[in-house]
Amino acid sequence: PSTTTDVCKIFKERYSWYKAAKKTEKRWKIPVSVSMAIIKQESSFIADARPERRKLLGFIPWKRVTSARGYAQAVDGTWEMYLNDRGGWFVSRNDFEDSVDFVGWYNYKTHKQLGISVNNARALYLAYHEGRGGYKRGSYRNKPWLLTVADKVQRQADSYQVQYEGCKKKLGKRFIFF
């Protein structure tokens, strides 16, 4: 999208994303604003986002630090668990609908297992980043940079929520003529 700070503009530009995010909210009970804030942080809404490669001898591209990729930056093992739970073929981390559903699925499971509120984007993001086990152990506590990022995700979710409240009726009434 041409902007990533205004969820209404994102959805106006990419209406299919609105439908996918709304479907995820209905299915997993995770607010649109929370899912969108996490995806913004993880990939800046770039479909084929991947972590940088390490450098061998300081300049030769080497292995990536993690298997994370796509809008949701889902790592291989967690993506496989999602596929086993969800079923179906032709699911891709580079597809927005699949990625936002993954984020909803993961955060719903986190909410159920750890009791984190679906509106607490900060805590959900910490569990998303560290894994549920890491969150339970408090691995994020020794990562001040991650706490700063989680605060940023919460602020973005809050901002998206205010914006979304102002445009969701209009988005819901949109008709597409062929």
Predicted regions and their residues:
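Catalytic glycan-binding domains that act on GlcNAc-containing polysaccharides
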Residues: 2-171
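Gram-negative outer-membrane assembly/targeting C-terminal domains
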Residues: 170-178
